[in-house]
Structure formats: structure tokens, C-alpha cells
Amino acid sequence: MNTLLRFPGGRDRALTLSYDDGVNSDIPLMEILDAHGIRATFNINTALFAPEGMPMPDSVNTTETRRLSKEETVAAYKDTPHEVAVHALTHPFLQEMPASLVTYEVMEDRKNIEAMFGTVCRGMAYPYGTFNDTVVSCLRDSGIVYSRTTVSTGRFDIPVDWLRMPATCHHNDPRLPELCDQFLADTPGRPARLFYLWGHSYEFAHNQNWHIIRDFAKKMGGNDKIWYATNIEVYDYVTAFRRLEYSADGRRIHNPTALYLWLSTGGDAVCIPSGATVEI
């Protein structure tokens, strides 16, 4: 008997985005996403803030961008639906560093983010997309539970190796319209799907192609069949789902987690409340 992951509300697909470097063009990007109910994770380097008081460029109508200052960063991301995550303190090539400095880069960035936003920061994206097994081990020891690579699969698979997490595609991928159509097509009775889009918002300014993300948000947003989530929300939900406990015949399922979890056995989705045991 199949027991298929379903996202909150019984949905069979989820969408998440990831954007790097903490630049001023993240602000109009968030405005576009917010208008369509889409959530993203923004990965920042807390040693690279711009000086306070610098003029704010118009990154929508010009190609000019810059990093946000510390005060601007808090004002931009705090009290929004979006997540702020680690991108390492100084945006280094982590795989070229000894383990002690990798740990320093990750932990200091994490501590700064937590102090700025009052959160427990557990997510990350690799600067330059580069890493090795030593880096992965340092992340695990530093309390990081997922880290996005720059690998684009062109698929909607649910992550398995969260510290080497790939994306579906970059927003400049020529396959983007086709992938959106594939994702929006109904596939009843099939495994859950995750669309993961990544990039840098300054690319929209530098290339003056803001229409790409506007069109994407208009097409993919506001859909009752899609769960819109940050990276950490996807991680927490999928990890909780994988902790479900099954009886020997698979028909009795216990949810030991704090989340309400949904699954399907081929028909309608079933919700298993936190701490509950259900018969299917």
C-alpha cells in the first residue's frame, strides 16, 4: 500500500525560492512575491553590509544595485513571510578553507542573523555553490540542517540529502516556462512534487529582465493546489513526515511530531494531527 507525502491542506505540490547576497533588488523582488503569496529564503553575508546612509539605487528601472546596510537588511526582511538564512560571513570559497575557518564563517553568520531577527537560523546556501565533505560536516556540526547548492536538476524531487540540496532550476534557465507547465499539470495518485527556484535578484536589474520573475509569480502564485513555503518550512515538514510511525501492516500510523501531517493512500488526503494515531 502506497502512503504518499502530501503537503499542508492535502496539497500534492509545493513551491519555494532561494535568493542570495542581501542586495537592494531583493526589496522589489519581495514585493512581487508578496503580491502572489509566494515565499522565499534570502541568504545573506553579515560581514559585507553596505555602509549606513548610502543612496538607494533604483534597481527596477536601472541596472544599478548594491548590498543592503545592516539597518536596511533588518527593515527589508524582518516581519515578512520570508526566511533569512546563512550564506557564510564573507562569501568565501568554503572548500578552500580549513574546517576551523569554515565553522567560523558559518557560525558567525548564523549568530549575527539570529541576533538581528530574533530567530533560530538553521538554513544556508553555499557561496559560489562550492563545497566538499569537510564543509558538509562543519555545517552539520554548526546546526545547519539544509544547504542549497547551485545544481539544477530540472526535476521536482523531494530532497533526500538536505546538506547537498539541489534546485529545480535558476530563473534564467530557458526551460523555466516548460517546467512551470509541467509542475502545474495535475498528476493524481503520484508522489508529491517540489518546485525550487533560485538566483540572485541583482540579475534582474543587471539584465533588465524583471519580466521573468513577474511572469513566473503571476503564473505560479495564488494557486490553491500549491503550498507556498520557505526553505526551512519545507525541511521541517518533510522531516516531520519522515518520522511517522507505522504498524506492521501499515494501516495504523502515529504522528509523534508537533506538526499536522498529511498523506494519501491513493484517494483523498488524510490529516494526522500532532500526537495522534489514525487508521487508514
Describe these PLM feature segments.
Residues M1-G9, A35, T46, E114, ...:
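C-terminal domain-boundary segment and adjacent tail
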